Amino acid sequence: MKRFKTVHYTIHSNKIKDARGIRFAVLADLHGMEFGPDNRKLSETIHRYRPDGILIAGDMVVRNDSASLKTASSLLRSLAQQYPVYYALGNHEYKLYRTDPQENCMAARYQEYEKELKTAGIHILHNESCSLQVGKNSLTVCGLEVPLILSLIHISEPTRH
């Protein structure tokens, strides 16, 4: 059976006004995988942590696998019924987004995927930012489409707990 890993990061900031803090679930690199029927195991784990929102860090799909679009769409539309969802593209989405849908059927399917997600209220951030309110806190979430060559630059990770 496929497994996913839950990692907790704590980021401290004097700008966070609520004593409880802010809690996000971050999904990345699922590549169309399913964890239990209808991604039930993943959804239940997310619900257990009661996040204030869901941040997608890309690669929910595989650029040459149309089934991955269906799996990701189903999961994200389900999550969007309970949480605000913000989606930044990974390299698989980016390549499909930048490809002419007239020349590539997967790029055309990807456009439909984005439409489905937007209809469900998911914020897809193409080099954009949006503001959100979580309790007493105002936050800005950004989605950057970084040229793939820049992904070779190393950025250190926050402390894991």
Set out the residue ranges of the language-model regions.
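N-terminal membrane-anchoring alpha-helices
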Residues: 1-19
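General small-molecule cofactor/ligand-binding pocket signal
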Residues: 12, 25, 123-128, 142
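Short strand-coil-strand connectors
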Residues: 14, 133-135
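Active-site-proximal beta-strand elements of phosphoester/diester hydrolases
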Residues: 21-31, 138-148
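Histidine-centered divalent metal-coordination motifs
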Residues: 31-33, 91-92, 154
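Short, glycine/acidic-enriched loop or turn micro-motifs at the edges of active sites
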Residues: 32, 62, 146, 160
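Core catalytic region of metal-dependent phosphoesterases/phosphodiesterases
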Residues: 38-133
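Residue-level detector of conserved catalytic or cofactor/ligand-binding positions
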Residues: 151-161
